[in-house]
C-alpha cells in the first residue's frame, strides 16, 4: 500500500493541511452511516489518496450530501484549491451541483443546502425541489427555501396537497400560515388528506375553511382507502351514507374493508343498490369475507346477469365461487359460461369444481377444451380429456379448430400436447393437411 501511495499525485499535498483539519470532521465521519466500502477512506488522514485508489464508482460528494456531511464538502473545496488533479469521484463539478442540491433538500440537511447555494446552486431552478423536503417533513429546509423566494404555491398549491397526502401536519400548518389556500383546486387538498388517512389534517383543513360539502362524496374516498376513523368523522358531520347510490358502501366492499361495510350496513346502507353492486365488486376483487357478510345480509348473488360468479371465475377465486354457488348462484347459465371462462384462464380448481357440480364441459362444441388448448392451458385440457373429451372425434375437429385459430408458437405447443397424449403422428399430419387446403 505504501508503494502505491508514493506514486499518487496527492503525495505532494501539504501534510500540515491534514493535521489542521478540525477534530469534529473525523467525529462526523465516524458517526455517519456511509457505505462500509469507503469507511476506511473516510476515517484515514490519507482520505483522498485512498479515494484515488478506489476502483468503485462511488461518488464521495454524493454520499456526503446524502448524509449531511458539511465538513467533507468544505474539505473537498479546500483540497481543490491546493490540487485540482484529484479523483473524479471527489471533484466538485458545478454541472452536478443542482442534483446535489435536490438530494440535500430531500434528506433535510439545511447546512448542506445553504452551502450548495453559496457554491452557486440555484435553489429556484426547479419548483420540484420543494417536493422532497415537504413530503419528508423537513420544515426548516422548507422555511429556508421559502425565504430564498422559492414559489411554494405553484400549480395551485401543489405543495400543500403533497404535505396533506403524506401526513405532514406541521408542514400543512406552516404552508397555510404563509398563504397557501386550503380550498384551491376545488378543495383537492382535503381529498388528498382523506386519501392519506390523516384525520388530524382533515379536521385542520376543515377548520381553516376547506368545504367537504363541495367534494364529490368525501365519505366514499375514505371508504375506498379503508380509513374507518375518517368514515366515522364524516358520518358525525351528517354526510349522507347513501349518496351516489350508496357509493360509499360499494367502495368499501370493492376494496375489502369489511369493518366499514358492516358499519355502513348497520347505519342503513342498501346492499342491493345499483344491481347489488357491493357483492358484485367484492366478488370481482376476491374479498371472500365481504362476500360472505353480504350474502348473510341477503345480497342478490345473481344480480346483473350473474356478474359476481362470472368475474370470480375469470379471476380464479375458487372459495368465492363455492360460496356463491352454495348460496344459490347460477353457474350453468349462458351455455356454461363459468366453466368456459375458467378453462380458458387455466383455473384448474374451478374447472374441476364446476364439472363435479354438473357443468357440461362439452357445451358449445366442446368450447371449454378448445379455449384451454388455444390458451395453452394443458393441465385443464388433460383433465377434460380424462373426463371424456376425445380430440380425435369427428375427424379431429377440436384439434383442427385449435390449430387453425392459433399462432405458430401456440400451434407447436398444441402439437406437442397432442403427440404426448395420443402418440399418433398421423393425427397431426392429417390435421395440418386438412387446415391448409
Curated annotation (Swiss-Prot):
Cystine crosslinks: none
Domain of life from the UniProt record: Viruses
Pfam families tied to this protein: Ank_2
SMART domains: ANK
ANK repeat positions: 56-86, 96-125, 127-154, 156-184, 185-213, 214-243, 244-273, 275-303, 305-333, 334-363
Keywords attached to this entry: ANK repeat, Repeat
Protein name, per record: Putative ankyrin repeat protein R787
Organism: Acanthamoeba polyphaga mimivirus (APMV)
Lineage per the UniProt record: Viruses, Varidnaviria, Bamfordvirae, Nucleocytoviricota, Megaviricetes
